[in-house]
Amino acid sequence: MPSVISTDVLIVGAGVAGLWLNARLRRQGFSTVLVESASLGGGQSLKSQGIIHGGAKYALHGALSGASEAIADMPRRWREALDGKGELDLSGVRLLSEAHYLWSPGTIAGNLTSFFASKAVRGRVDQVKGEQLPPALQNPKFKGKVYRLAELVVDVPSLIGRLAELAGDSLLAGQHIEPLFEGDELIGLRVDGRDIHAQRIVLSAGGGNADLLNALGVSQPQMQRRPLHMVLVKGPTLKPLYAHCLGGGPKPRITVTTHPAADGQWVWYLGGDLAEADGVARQPDAQIAVARKELEALLPWVDLSQAQWATLRVDRAEPAQSGLVRPDNAFLDSQQRLMIGWPTKLALAPDFADRVLSQLSGDGIHPTPQAALSDVPRPPMAIPVWDELLP
C-alpha cells in the first residue's frame, strides 16, 4: 500500500449523508475515500425514524417557512431512487410504508383547517377511512380523522446496507484524524497514520463535526445540538402505524413509526413532542410512564400488558443559529479545500449532496483516475437501536 493515498474527495462521517454523497460522487466518476470512526450509520442515521417527509408537519402552523419549500421535493427524489430510476439506484431497499399519516384523535380539528389550506400540503393530502386506515387504527373505538401524506418511510438499516454496497472499496475505518498542511494550506488528513491527499475534504460527521473542526483549528461554523428523548416499545400485539398524532400545538403530539425487530415482532418508535424539551428533562422511567399514558389515551384498544419498553437519547446535530430554531435546508460551508456540512434531516441527504456537487463544479474540480483502496480496515455496520435496546 502506498504511503500516501490520493483521492478527489475525502469524506469524514459515514451516516446517510456521507454515504449518499459518496455514492453520488462515485457515480459521476470521482474517486473518493469515506472515513468512519465507529460504525456505518451508527451516529444519528440509525436512530432516525426513517420518515422522508416533504415538510407537511412544518406547515401545521399554517405559516409556511422556507423549510416546507426546500424539503417539498424530497419524497419524489427518494421515491425515484427507491424505484431504481433516480440519482442513485436504491432498488432493493426496504420501504416500511408508502405513506406517512396525520391523525387527529377526534378532539382537535381546528388547526387542521389552516393546515390544509396552506400550499405546503395542497394536493398532497387525502383523508382515509375504513380499510385504508393504518392497521393499528382499524378499530371500532377509533373516532379520529386520518389523512395520508405523500411522504414515505424507509427502513434505515436496509438503506445503509445498500449505500455501503454503492461505496464499493471507498470505505475506511479510522479513529485518529489530524490535518495535513502544505505551508498554510490544508491538503488532506492523516487517518490513523495514513496520509490521504484530496482535492476537497468534506466533513459530514453529524455530531462528530465539532471535534473534527477543533482538530483542524477551524472556529466557524459552530455546531449546536438539539436533544430528543425517544421511546421504544415492542410487543406481540403491535400493528404497523406510521403517523403524526396532532395535539394543540405546532408540533405533533406524538410521532409513531414501526420497525421490524430481529425476532419478528414490531417495535413502535415514538418521537414528536413527547421526545422534545419536557421529555428530555425526564428520567427514562418517567418518560416511559408518560409514553404509556399517551398510548393508552390515544389507542386504548391496544393491549400493552406484554410490551417491553426502553428510551433513547439522541442529539440532532446542526449548524448553530440563534434561538435554536430548526434549520431549513441541508447546510454546507466551504473554506478553500474544506467543506463542512450538516444535512440536518435524513430526508435532506440528496440536498446535501447537491450542494457539495455544485460547490465542486463551481470550484472547477473534476474527476481524476486513482488507484482503488485495498488492504485497509473497513467500518462495520451498526446494529439497529431496537435490537440493541430491546433484544
Where are these regions (language model features)?
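Active-site substrate-recognition segment that forms the wall
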Residues: 203-335
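Short hydrophobic core segments
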Residues: 12, 196-208
